[in-house]
Amino acid sequence: YGGGVIPRFSEVASQFPLSSEFHTLRVQPPPGMHYNTDVLRKMCDIWEEHGSGLIAFHGQSGDIMFQGATTAKVQDAFDAINELGFDLGGAGPAVRTSMSCVGAARCEQSCYDEARAHRQVLNTFVDDIHRPALPYKFKFKFSGCPNDCMNSIQRADMAVIGTWRDNIRTDEALAKKWFAKHGMNELVNDVVSRCPTKAIQIKEIGKLRHDANIS
């Protein structure tokens, strides 16, 4: 199983026989964490039949954690999960399971197709996920914008973050309406000074420059 099964054997099995084996199957989530209720019910049925019934959505690497299987039931559980279209994730010194935000499917902040990038990258490295052969773990995470909902900066070795590459888009009528209500102090303190790249400046109308590359 490579890195996808975390074996756990108890040192007190002679005293507590039911604790003798409690293995975990790490299963890769779909890009964007999209599930329908039919799939979730089937997952629950599989784990009730072959495991303890305890499932964690999701581990810190993004895996669905099917916790509590015996050695004899690991293969049966994997086969049933695999029939649903899911594959084991990674553990140890390998390429780990990845995560991507809901992104282009539902979020207006999305700057690229996160689900497509997630799938293509992970499919490319699937052999390195299943067969640990690296000196240390390696994680990809995909966030569609600098809000970084996947915490890729903190949690990944390769953070893929969508950014805006164009002029700032403004609604002049809305901006004037907002300014009339909030005034100069809020404009400076809550808008201009909060731009990390200092892309916004306040100019007198007579000193404005007009150019195709200036919003």
Show the residue positions of the predicted features.
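Cys2His2 zinc-finger metal-binding sites
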Residues: V188
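Small-residue-enriched alpha-helical segments and adjacent helix-cap loops
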Residues: H23-N185, R194, K198, K207-I214
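Short, non-ligating residues that shape and space the ligands of small metal-coordination modules
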Residues: Q201-I202
